[in-house]
Amino acid sequence: DREAILTQARAVLGDEVDTLDSADALQHTRAVQLCLLIAGVAWARELQRQGVDPQMVSGLSIGAFPAAVIAGALDFASALRLVALRADLMEQAYPEGYGLTAIMGLTRPWVEALMQGHEVYLANLNAETQFVIAGRDEAMAEVAQLALRAGASKAQRLAVSVPSHCALLDKPAAELAKAFAGASLRRPRCAYLSGSTARVLWDPQRIADDLATTLLLATDKPV
């Protein structure tokens, strides 16, 4: 139940758990990512309590971690530690001046053409004319203005404090991969579907690799 989840989280994170959902805390990606992990596991366990047992799990980006927990591939305590590290590595690499911007109403070739010469990356391919770019604030603002002039219906800076799903996170992803060496992953009880490759993974090492690269790979019409 809810209290059992929070008790398990406090055993790893201490009193931080009680302030994660505050407005101040949610300005930082650590709180956002931990909240998404805890909420994802809590809701899935509630469904299990009601008799809903999954045959397959999947998650987009940070959602892959609660998916792995529910599949039995990764224990909740390890997931908490790894997600906290994931967030810290991202924020330490880019403490300010970087993030994400959504662009709607233009096709992919058009968006990619506007990105040329700017320090930005295509991070999310959500639909045929809906994309998210990652990079420096100034560079994203320039591309956003170009997009609006080119006929985009919307170009909006997202409330995200770090860049995601792009090559800017090569080093944090490598550090996170090293941390997985100390985590014990198991063969999942049900199918684990990679949100990045749309392939079912059963091998614990392949699942670990998939989780480690969730912050790095662009998401293309996420499954």
Residue positions per predicted region:
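Helix-rich "cap/lid" substructures immediately adjacent to catalytic or cofactor-binding pockets
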Residues: 1-58, 133
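Alpha/beta catalytic cores of group-transfer enzymes, especially the acyltransferase/condensing modules
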Residues: 3, 10-11, 15, 71-218
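A short small-residue
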Residues: 19-26, 66, 154-158
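Short, glycine/charge-rich beta-strand/loop segments that flank catalytic centers
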Residues: 23-25, 58-62, 87, 98-102
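A short, mixed-charge helix-start or loop-turn motif at secondary-structure junctions
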Residues: 25-29, 68, 210
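Gly/Ala-rich beta-loop-alpha elbow adjacent to hydrolase catalytic centers
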Residues: 40, 55, 59-63, 67, ...
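Conserved functional loop/turn residues at catalytic and ligand-binding sites
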Residues: 51, 61, 184
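A short, well-structured juxtamembrane/interface segment
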Residues: 219-223
